[in-house]
């Protein structure tokens, strides 16, 4: 048995969930009265995203906890990060970009995940205030020979920063420029200049490419000093289909 931490990622492409009355009715049955009020307040596109996200989270967590999805009670920490009460500790985090929802789950420790679509029209230098000089230099390193790498590198750095603040639950209150990432061929180095250096070492990061035009990054708080985690990734359409997928790790020569 592996001594690495185990992380499961569930990818749900919203556009592949059938838009028919039977599916909608079935999914709505999993919402609490408070969640139904929230659902009713959204515009149709946002309401659909909220509904599918909730059903995805509840079905996956119910399986982990050995309970019914109707029994999954999602609560919020004071910092706004969601958690679930159960017979054992299960940590999770949710993200979405365009019509892709990603849920990351583990029993190891706090986890954060962020996904972004790689927009090759994005003027990333307009947000260079959130980047350390060393990050800017790395992003532009191959600009003359491979211009597309600039965007992949920028969105990798961005998702790494977001995954960390989602893992810690501190949100955008933390100055992103002070979260410095150095992406090496074998691992990702991280320095949080606003925090204790020893605490920084508790976090482990990985980045992946999904369907060629999305990048997602995972931040895992390693409570047992394990250097890596095993990732099992699935495409899941709740109550419709599930199959294993293999996202491509972000690598650079």
Regions found by a protein language model. Name each.
Residues 1-253:
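Core catalytic alpha/beta fold that binds nucleotide/phospho-ligands
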């Amino acid at each position: 048995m592996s001594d690495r931490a185990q992380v499961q990622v569930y990818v749900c492409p919203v556009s592949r969930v059938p838009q028919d009355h039977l599916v909608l009715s079935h999914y709505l049955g999993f919402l609490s009265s408070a969640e139904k009020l929230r659902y009713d307040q959204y515009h149709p596109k946002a309401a659909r995203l909220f509904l599918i996200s909730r059903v995805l989270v509840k079905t996956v967590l119910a399986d982990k906890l050995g309970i019914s999805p109707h029994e999954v009670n999602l609560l919020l920490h004071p910092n706004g990060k969601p958690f679930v009460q159960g017979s054992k500790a299960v940590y999770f985090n949710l993200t979405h970009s365009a019509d892709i929802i990603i849920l990351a789950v583990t029993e190891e420790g706090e986890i954060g995940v962020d996904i972004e679509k790689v927009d090759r029209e994005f003027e990333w230098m307009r947000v260079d205030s959130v980047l350390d000089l060393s990050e800017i230099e790395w992003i532009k390193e191959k600009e003359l020979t491979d211009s597309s790498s600039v965007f992949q590198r920028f969105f990798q750095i961005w998702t790494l920063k977001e995954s960390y603040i989602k893992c810690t639950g501190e949100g955008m209150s933390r100055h992103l420029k002070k979260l410095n990432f150095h992406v090496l061929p074998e691992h990702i180095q991280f320095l949080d200049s606003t925090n204790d250096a020893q605490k920084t070492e508790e976090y482990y990061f990985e980045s992946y490419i999904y369907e060629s035009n999305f990048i997602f990054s995972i931040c895992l708080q390693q409570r047992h000093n394990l250097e890596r985690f095993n990732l099992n990734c699935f495409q899941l359409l709740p109550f419709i289909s599930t199959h294993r997928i293999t996202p491509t790790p972000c690598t650079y020569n």
